[in-house]
Amino acid sequence: MAEVVTGRFAPSPTGALHAGSMVAALASWLDVRAQGGVWLVRMEDVDTPRCVPGAAEQILSQLAACGLNSDRPPMWQSSRGAAYGAALAQLVEAGLAYPCACTRKQIEQDALAAGHLHLRQAERVYPGTCRPERGGLAGRAARAWRLHTARAGGSAAVSWSDRRLGRRSQGVEAAVGDFVLRRADGLWAYQLAVVVDDAAQGITDVVRGEDLADNTARQILLQRALGLPMPRYLHTPLVLAADGQKLSKQNGAVPVAMDDPAGVLRAAAAVLGLTLDAGRPVGETLAQAVALWRAGWLAR
Protein backbone atom coordinates (compact mmCIF):
# COMPACT_ATOMS: atom_id res chain seq x y z
CA MET A 1 0.00 0.00 0.00
CA ALA A 2 1.33 3.42 -0.95
CA GLU A 3 2.18 5.77 1.90
CA VAL A 4 -0.39 8.45 2.61
CA VAL A 5 1.48 11.64 3.44
CA THR A 6 0.05 12.86 6.72
CA GLY A 7 0.98 16.05 8.52
CA ARG A 8 -0.28 17.92 11.53
CA PHE A 9 -0.48 21.30 13.18
CA ALA A 10 -0.33 20.94 16.94
CA PRO A 11 -0.85 24.22 18.81
CA SER A 12 -1.06 24.58 22.57
CA PRO A 13 -4.33 26.34 23.48
CA THR A 14 -2.68 28.92 25.71
CA GLY A 15 -4.02 31.76 23.56
CA ALA A 16 -5.01 32.64 20.01
CA LEU A 17 -2.67 32.12 17.06
CA HIS A 18 -0.10 34.86 16.46
CA ALA A 19 2.00 35.58 13.37
CA GLY A 20 4.60 32.93 14.23
CA SER A 21 2.12 30.14 14.81
CA MET A 22 0.32 31.04 11.57
CA VAL A 23 3.57 30.37 9.69
CA ALA A 24 3.79 26.91 11.23
CA ALA A 25 0.14 26.19 10.47
CA LEU A 26 0.43 27.27 6.84
CA ALA A 27 3.71 25.42 6.25
CA SER A 28 2.36 22.13 7.57
CA TRP A 29 -0.84 22.53 5.52
CA LEU A 30 1.01 23.43 2.32
CA ASP A 31 3.43 20.52 2.65
CA VAL A 32 0.58 18.04 2.89
CA ARG A 33 -1.60 19.61 0.19
CA ALA A 34 1.34 19.78 -2.23
CA GLN A 35 1.69 16.01 -1.84
CA GLY A 36 -2.01 15.17 -1.94
CA GLY A 37 -2.00 14.08 1.68
CA VAL A 38 -3.99 14.41 4.90
CA TRP A 39 -3.71 17.38 7.26
CA LEU A 40 -4.66 17.06 10.92
CA VAL A 41 -5.02 19.40 13.87
CA ARG A 42 -4.01 18.27 17.35
CA MET A 43 -4.64 20.35 20.45
CA GLU A 44 -1.63 19.93 22.69
CA ASP A 45 -3.52 20.65 25.89
CA VAL A 46 -1.60 18.13 27.99
CA ASP A 47 -0.27 20.97 30.19
CA THR A 48 -3.74 21.79 31.44
CA PRO A 49 -2.79 24.54 33.95
CA ARG A 50 -1.42 26.66 31.09
CA CYS A 51 -4.45 26.23 28.83
CA VAL A 52 -6.80 29.19 28.45
CA PRO A 53 -10.55 28.51 28.32
CA GLY A 54 -11.88 29.20 24.83
CA ALA A 55 -8.42 29.38 23.22
CA ALA A 56 -8.80 26.10 21.33
CA GLU A 57 -12.07 27.23 19.80
CA GLN A 58 -10.49 30.55 18.85
CA ILE A 59 -7.58 28.76 17.19
CA LEU A 60 -9.92 26.54 15.17
CA SER A 61 -11.90 29.61 14.12
CA GLN A 62 -8.74 31.39 12.95
CA LEU A 63 -7.65 28.35 10.95
CA ALA A 64 -11.09 28.01 9.36
CA ALA A 65 -11.10 31.67 8.33
CA CYS A 66 -7.84 31.02 6.48
CA GLY A 67 -9.18 27.89 4.79
CA LEU A 68 -7.01 25.58 6.91
CA ASN A 69 -9.44 22.88 7.99
CA SER A 70 -8.45 19.57 9.53
CA ASP A 71 -9.32 16.52 7.46
CA ARG A 72 -10.44 14.71 10.62
CA PRO A 73 -11.83 15.88 13.96
CA PRO A 74 -9.05 17.43 16.07
CA MET A 75 -7.27 15.22 18.59
CA TRP A 76 -7.07 16.47 22.19
CA GLN A 77 -4.08 15.37 24.24
CA SER A 78 -6.06 15.80 27.46
CA SER A 79 -8.11 12.75 26.44
CA ARG A 80 -5.08 10.57 25.69
CA GLY A 81 -3.89 9.63 29.17
CA ALA A 82 -4.49 5.90 28.70
CA ALA A 83 -2.29 5.82 25.58
CA TYR A 84 0.51 7.67 27.35
CA GLY A 85 0.22 5.36 30.34
CA ALA A 86 0.54 2.32 28.09
CA ALA A 87 3.66 3.77 26.47
CA LEU A 88 5.24 4.46 29.85
CA ALA A 89 4.41 0.93 31.01
CA GLN A 90 6.12 -0.44 27.90
CA LEU A 91 9.25 1.57 28.65
CA VAL A 92 9.25 0.49 32.31
CA GLU A 93 8.88 -3.17 31.36
CA ALA A 94 11.84 -2.83 28.99
CA GLY A 95 13.95 -1.23 31.72
CA LEU A 96 14.09 2.07 29.85
CA ALA A 97 12.19 4.27 32.33
CA TYR A 98 12.52 4.74 36.08
CA PRO A 99 10.90 6.74 38.90
CA CYS A 100 12.65 9.86 40.18
CA ALA A 101 12.33 11.47 43.62
CA CYS A 102 14.53 14.51 42.97
CA THR A 103 13.43 18.10 43.48
CA ARG A 104 14.90 20.90 41.37
CA LYS A 105 17.05 21.93 44.31
CA GLN A 106 18.48 18.44 44.67
CA ILE A 107 19.14 18.19 40.94
CA GLU A 108 21.07 21.46 41.13
CA GLN A 109 23.10 20.27 44.11
CA ASP A 110 23.84 16.81 42.69
CA ALA A 111 24.78 18.16 39.28
CA LEU A 112 27.24 20.65 40.73
CA ALA A 113 28.69 18.03 43.09
CA ALA A 114 29.29 15.75 40.10
CA GLY A 115 30.97 18.55 38.19
CA HIS A 116 28.12 18.87 35.69
CA LEU A 117 28.26 22.60 35.07
CA HIS A 118 26.36 22.52 31.79
CA LEU A 119 23.17 24.59 31.85
CA ARG A 120 20.26 23.80 29.57
CA GLN A 121 17.60 26.49 29.33
CA ALA A 122 18.73 27.86 32.72
CA GLU A 123 18.52 24.44 34.40
CA ARG A 124 21.09 21.75 35.15
CA VAL A 125 21.13 18.60 33.05
CA TYR A 126 19.78 15.80 35.24
CA PRO A 127 22.79 13.86 36.63
CA GLY A 128 21.04 10.49 36.88
CA THR A 129 20.73 10.46 40.66
CA CYS A 130 17.74 8.07 40.74
CA ARG A 131 18.95 5.67 38.07
CA PRO A 132 18.38 2.08 39.28
CA GLU A 133 22.08 1.24 39.10
CA ARG A 134 22.82 4.17 41.41
CA GLY A 135 20.44 3.12 44.15
CA GLY A 136 17.14 4.25 42.71
CA LEU A 137 14.73 6.04 45.00
CA ALA A 138 16.67 5.03 48.13
CA GLY A 139 13.50 5.01 50.20
CA ARG A 140 12.19 8.32 48.91
CA ALA A 141 8.78 8.83 47.33
CA ALA A 142 8.66 8.91 43.53
CA ARG A 143 7.84 12.29 42.03
CA ALA A 144 8.33 11.84 38.29
CA TRP A 145 9.29 9.26 35.66
CA ARG A 146 12.35 9.63 33.43
CA LEU A 147 13.77 7.93 30.34
CA HIS A 148 17.04 6.11 30.96
CA THR A 149 18.79 7.70 28.01
CA ALA A 150 21.90 5.51 28.19
CA ARG A 151 19.90 2.29 28.02
CA ALA A 152 17.73 3.77 25.26
CA GLY A 153 20.78 4.51 23.12
CA GLY A 154 21.18 8.18 23.96
CA SER A 155 24.87 7.92 24.85
CA ALA A 156 25.66 7.82 21.14
CA ALA A 157 24.71 10.65 18.83
CA VAL A 158 21.16 10.57 17.53
CA SER A 159 21.28 11.76 13.92
CA TRP A 160 18.62 12.70 11.41
CA SER A 161 18.24 14.72 8.23
CA ASP A 162 16.09 17.84 8.34
CA ARG A 163 14.58 18.88 5.02
CA ARG A 164 15.69 22.48 5.54
CA LEU A 165 18.45 22.43 8.16
CA GLY A 166 20.29 19.42 6.75
CA ARG A 167 22.11 16.78 8.76
CA ARG A 168 21.61 17.17 12.51
CA SER A 169 22.98 15.26 15.47
CA GLN A 170 22.72 15.32 19.26
CA GLY A 171 24.05 13.16 22.08
CA VAL A 172 20.91 13.16 24.21
CA GLU A 173 22.46 11.80 27.40
CA ALA A 174 25.13 14.50 27.53
CA ALA A 175 23.09 17.38 26.13
CA VAL A 176 19.75 16.74 27.83
CA GLY A 177 20.11 13.95 30.35
CA ASP A 178 17.39 11.55 31.44
CA PHE A 179 14.38 13.64 30.51
CA VAL A 180 10.96 13.55 32.14
CA LEU A 181 8.17 11.36 30.78
CA ARG A 182 5.64 12.04 33.52
CA ARG A 183 5.91 15.12 35.67
CA ALA A 184 5.88 15.42 39.44
CA ASP A 185 2.40 16.99 39.25
CA GLY A 186 1.10 13.89 37.47
CA LEU A 187 0.82 15.52 34.04
CA TRP A 188 2.32 13.84 31.00
CA ALA A 189 5.44 15.39 29.53
CA TYR A 190 5.33 16.87 26.04
CA GLN A 191 8.03 14.59 24.60
CA LEU A 192 6.19 11.37 25.38
CA ALA A 193 2.79 12.73 24.37
CA VAL A 194 3.90 14.02 20.98
CA VAL A 195 5.69 10.79 20.05
CA VAL A 196 2.72 8.61 21.00
CA ASP A 197 0.27 10.88 19.20
CA ASP A 198 2.34 11.21 16.01
CA ALA A 199 2.38 7.43 15.73
CA ALA A 200 -1.32 7.09 16.56
CA GLN A 201 -2.26 9.60 13.87
CA GLY A 202 0.07 8.09 11.27
CA ILE A 203 2.11 11.27 10.90
CA THR A 204 4.67 10.88 8.12
CA ASP A 205 5.90 14.48 7.98
CA VAL A 206 6.44 16.82 10.93
CA VAL A 207 6.59 20.43 9.75
CA ARG A 208 7.05 22.93 12.57
CA GLY A 209 9.04 25.98 13.66
CA GLU A 210 12.81 25.87 13.98
CA ASP A 211 12.58 26.51 17.73
CA LEU A 212 11.31 22.94 18.11
CA ALA A 213 14.23 21.35 16.26
CA ASP A 214 16.04 20.76 19.55
CA ASN A 215 13.28 18.34 20.59
CA THR A 216 13.83 16.05 17.63
CA ALA A 217 16.63 13.86 18.99
CA ARG A 218 14.66 13.11 22.16
CA GLN A 219 11.61 12.24 20.11
CA ILE A 220 13.58 9.94 17.82
CA LEU A 221 15.07 8.23 20.88
CA LEU A 222 11.57 7.61 22.22
CA GLN A 223 10.34 6.40 18.82
CA ARG A 224 13.12 3.82 18.76
CA ALA A 225 12.49 2.77 22.35
CA LEU A 226 8.78 2.27 21.68
CA GLY A 227 9.24 0.66 18.27
CA LEU A 228 7.42 3.48 16.48
CA PRO A 229 8.08 4.83 12.96
CA MET A 230 10.14 7.97 12.54
CA PRO A 231 8.53 10.72 10.45
CA ARG A 232 10.41 13.10 8.19
CA TYR A 233 11.20 16.48 9.72
CA LEU A 234 11.12 20.01 8.34
CA HIS A 235 11.76 22.97 10.62
CA THR A 236 10.69 26.31 9.18
CA PRO A 237 12.03 29.86 9.70
CA LEU A 238 10.79 31.77 12.72
CA VAL A 239 9.06 35.10 13.04
CA LEU A 240 11.22 37.24 15.33
CA ALA A 241 10.17 39.85 17.85
CA ALA A 242 11.75 43.30 18.15
CA ASP A 243 14.37 41.89 20.54
CA GLY A 244 15.50 39.34 17.96
CA GLN A 245 14.00 36.43 19.88
CA LYS A 246 11.32 34.09 18.60
CA LEU A 247 7.94 35.80 18.56
CA SER A 248 5.81 34.32 21.33
CA LYS A 249 3.10 35.18 23.78
CA GLN A 250 5.84 35.83 26.34
CA ASN A 251 7.41 38.69 24.37
CA GLY A 252 4.39 40.55 23.14
CA ALA A 253 2.94 38.52 20.29
CA VAL A 254 -0.64 39.57 19.63
CA PRO A 255 -3.43 37.42 18.18
CA VAL A 256 -3.73 37.52 14.41
CA ALA A 257 -6.83 39.48 13.40
CA MET A 258 -8.99 37.77 10.80
CA ASP A 259 -10.48 40.80 9.07
CA ASP A 260 -8.28 39.95 6.04
CA PRO A 261 -7.53 36.20 6.04
CA ALA A 262 -5.88 36.30 2.60
CA GLY A 263 -3.55 39.00 3.89
CA VAL A 264 -2.71 36.83 6.90
CA LEU A 265 -1.82 34.00 4.53
CA ARG A 266 0.34 36.27 2.37
CA ALA A 267 2.27 37.48 5.42
CA ALA A 268 2.86 33.92 6.64
CA ALA A 269 3.87 32.77 3.16
CA ALA A 270 6.41 35.59 2.91
CA VAL A 271 8.26 34.18 5.94
CA LEU A 272 8.47 30.90 4.02
CA GLY A 273 9.91 32.67 0.98
CA LEU A 274 6.68 32.54 -1.02
CA THR A 275 5.39 35.69 -2.71
CA LEU A 276 1.64 35.58 -3.24
CA ASP A 277 -0.50 37.92 -5.31
CA ALA A 278 -2.55 40.51 -3.46
CA GLY A 279 -6.25 40.87 -4.11
CA ARG A 280 -7.07 37.18 -4.42
CA PRO A 281 -9.64 35.43 -2.21
CA VAL A 282 -8.53 32.82 0.30
CA GLY A 283 -9.09 29.82 -1.98
CA GLU A 284 -7.03 31.25 -4.85
CA THR A 285 -4.35 32.45 -2.43
CA LEU A 286 -3.96 28.95 -1.03
CA ALA A 287 -3.91 27.38 -4.50
CA GLN A 288 -1.09 29.70 -5.55
CA ALA A 289 0.79 28.93 -2.33
CA VAL A 290 0.49 25.18 -2.90
CA ALA A 291 1.92 25.51 -6.41
CA LEU A 292 4.84 27.61 -5.16
CA TRP A 293 5.52 25.20 -2.29
CA ARG A 294 5.52 22.26 -4.68
CA ALA A 295 7.97 24.03 -6.98
CA GLY A 296 10.19 25.26 -4.14
CA TRP A 297 10.19 23.38 -0.85
CA LEU A 298 9.29 19.96 -2.29
CA ALA A 299 11.90 20.30 -5.01
CA ARG A 300 14.73 20.59 -2.47
Curated annotation (Swiss-Prot):
Alphabetical UniProt keywords: Aminoacyl-tRNA synthetase, ATP-binding, Ligase, Metal-binding, Nucleotide-binding, Zinc
GO biological process: glutamyl-tRNA aminoacylation; tRNA modification
Enzyme class: ligase
EC number, UniProt record: 6.1.1.-
Names of required cofactors: Zn(2+)
Binding locations of Zn(2+): C100, C102, Y126, C130
Chain span(s) of sequence motif 'HIGH' region: 11-21
Job description of the protein: Catalyzes the tRNA-independent activation of glutamate in presence of ATP and the subsequent transfer of glutamate onto a tRNA(Asp). Glutamate is transferred on the 2-amino-5-(4,5-dihydroxy-2-cyclopenten-1-yl) moiety of the queuosine in the wobble position of the QUC anticodon.
Short motif 'KMSKS' region, span: 246-250
Statement: the UniProt record of this protein carries the keyword Mitochondrion: no
Residues annotated for ATP binding in this entry: K249
Listed name of the protein: Glutamyl-Q tRNA(Asp) synthetase
CC per GO annotation: cytosol
Gene: gluQ
Alphabetical list of InterPro entries matching this protein: Glu-Q_tRNA(Asp)_Synthase (IPR022380), Glu/Gln-tRNA-synth (IPR000924), Glu/Gln-tRNA-synth_Ib_cat-dom (IPR020058), GluQ/Sye (IPR049940), Rossmann-like_a/b/a_fold (IPR014729)
Annotated binding of L-glutamate, by residue: R8, F9, A10, P11, S12, E44, Y190, R208
UniProt keyword annotation of Zinc present: yes
Family, similarity comment: Belongs to the class-I aminoacyl-tRNA synthetase family. GluQ subfamily.
Molecular function GO labels: ATP binding; glutamate-tRNA ligase activity; zinc ion binding
Note accompanying the cofactor annotation: Binds 1 zinc ion per subunit.
Organism phylogeny: Bacteria, Pseudomonadati, Pseudomonadota, Betaproteobacteria, Burkholderiales
Chain segments annotated as transmembrane: none
